[in-house]
Amino acid sequence: NPCPSAVEKLVSLLETDDNAYVRRATAWSLANYDNQIVLEPLIKALKNDVAAVRLWSSSSLAEIGNVSLKNAQLAAEQLLISLKIDNEPGVRSNCIWSLCRLYEKLNNTFQESFVDECTKIALFDKEPSVMEEAKTALDSMGMQGFYN
């Protein structure tokens, strides 16, 4: 259960704790908070050197993004960047999942960018699990056949 008085401490742990397990758990916990203060730290955590922190941050951004159109757009912009540049397949798959959760809240231009990126991944990615996640996302958005 979220505790409003814990938000600042959790954000501090995410940003400064030396233990990657603590940062990962904190990124996961922050999904329970719908206030604006957690959005930016989670976005910054997408650049963390530990894949598990990036993975859980991307999941939490899907939750925080669903709170408002503004949050959805801010989270989605960074998730799309991470999808394009992250080397870890699990993180990239999770970015696709998170973007798919935010899809309905995004403007048409961004939706098109996401569909284009998923199509490229479904057709050309070197990692089969990421390709499959992109195909699943396209199917869920009603874009069956875009990758055949």
Language-model segments: residues:
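Structural detector for internal amphipathic alpha-helices that build alpha-solenoid repeat scaffolds
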Residues: 1-3, 12, 21-35, 44, ...
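Amphipathic alpha-helical scaffolding segments comprising HEAT/armadillo-like alpha-solenoid repeats
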Residues: 2-14, 35-47, 69-83, 105-122, ...
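Short inter-helical turns and helix N-cap capping residues of alpha-solenoid HEAT/ARM repeat scaffolds
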Residues: 18-19, 49-50, 87-88, 126-127
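Short, mixed-charge aromatic SLiMs
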Residues: 54, 120-126
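Residues within HEAT/ARM-like alpha-solenoid scaffolds
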Residues: 74, 87-90, 113, 129
